[in-house]
């Protein structure tokens, strides 16, 4: 069983344990979600909201396990607004951003819709919350992309900044793989050794369980340069696991003889770039460079596995007003 699937299985087991004493009409809502991580975070949102309703007398029961269908019908939109306002104003801890508030509001709306569809409640109380109450001014943020010079300077720091040869070769291979494929760091740490396919076809590739996926693998190509550095790392990795008798199938291993963590990758990026470069910036670098080389946004969407062209275009297609004016003038 691959690491990501095993991790999802453990999340499912823990969640099942937490939901064991939760009324069925509430617990069944989470079966609608495919991703274990989504189930977990949505359960936390619902759990915290219901606990607040209990603590504030909106539901007159001792615990979530005692909640009935009638109790859910007693909750009003004003109760939910008060809860969301306390989150926004930091009364319940760290203040939530408007984006975070809207995410939770959307989960609550889906939850009440589910209850209404199953005839547990008469209406979706979230629908009565004014749409603009938690509206945030969404401003498009240009992606941060390091220059070629900054990337080379970063690689030099990675090469010179660590006396441990295994760490150096591994870290450079990680940087070159992200830079040569656009893979996400979360996807990278989930990779096992057998996910690499360097020689089966004319072009090297890897099989990736993408974002939010535990069943369907994506075929992701890599650059010749990334392949070259991976080959060097794989020789070092083979020596490393034989000397330490490691059986872990993880592609990238730590000095603790286990799979590298996402935090470890973020940490060495920050350390050797003085905080100027982080892994996702290299993903943006790939998208920009690939678009500039091909002028084909569909290549970018395919390689970076964006859900739609609009997302890819928003980040990587930059249109100059004067170019538009000149083109229209010639119509």
Describe the residue ranges of each PLM region.
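N-terminal core-binding DNA-recognition domain of tyrosine recombinases/integrases
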Residues: 6, 24-37, 44-141, 161
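A short, glycine-centered helix-capping/turn motif at helix boundaries
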Residues: 119, 177-190, 293-295, 306
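DNA breakage-rejoining catalytic core of tyrosine-based enzymes
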Residues: 136-155, 213-225, 241-242, 246
């Amino acid at each position: 069983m691959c690491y990501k699937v095993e991790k999802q299985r453990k999340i499912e087991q823990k969640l099942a344990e937490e939901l064991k004493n939760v009324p069925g009409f509430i617990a069944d809502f989470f079966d609608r979600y495919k991703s274990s991580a989504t189930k977990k975070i949505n359960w936390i949102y619902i759990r915290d909201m219901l606990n607040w309703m209990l603590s504030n007398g909106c539901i007159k029961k001792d615990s979530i396990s005692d909640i009935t269908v009638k109790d859910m019908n007693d909750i009003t939109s004003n109760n939910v607004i008060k809860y969301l306002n306390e989150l926004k104003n930091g009364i319940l801890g760290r203040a939530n951003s408007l984006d975070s508030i809207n995410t939770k509001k959307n989960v609550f709306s889906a939850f009440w819709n589910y209850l209404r569809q199953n005839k547990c409640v008469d209406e979706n109380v979230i629908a009565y919350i004014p749409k603009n109450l938690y509206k945030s001014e969404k401003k498009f943020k240009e992606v941060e992309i390091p220059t070629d010079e900054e990337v080379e300077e970063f690689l030099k720091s990675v090469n010179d900044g660590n006396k441990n040869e295994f760490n150096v070769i591994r870290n450079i291979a990680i940087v070159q793989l992200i830079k040569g494929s656009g893979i996400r760091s979360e996807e990278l740490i989930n990779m096992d050794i057998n996910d690499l396919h360097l020689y089966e076809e004319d072009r090297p590739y890897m099989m990736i369980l993408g974002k939010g996926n535990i069943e369907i693998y994506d075929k992701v190509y890599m650059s010749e340069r990334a392949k070259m550095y991976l080959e060097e790392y794989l020789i070092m990795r083979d020596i490393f696991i034989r000397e330490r008798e490691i059986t872990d199938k993880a592609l990238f291993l730590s000095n603790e003889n286990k799979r590298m963590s996402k935090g470890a990758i973020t940490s060495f990026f920050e350390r050797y770039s003085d905080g100027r470069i982080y892994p996702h910036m290299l993903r943006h670098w790939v998208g920009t460079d690939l678009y500039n080389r091909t002028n084909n946004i569909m290549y970018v969407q395919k390689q970076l596995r964006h859900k739609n062209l609009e997302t890819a275009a928003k980040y990587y297609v930059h249109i100059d007003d004067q170019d538009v004016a000149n083109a229209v003038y010639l119509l």
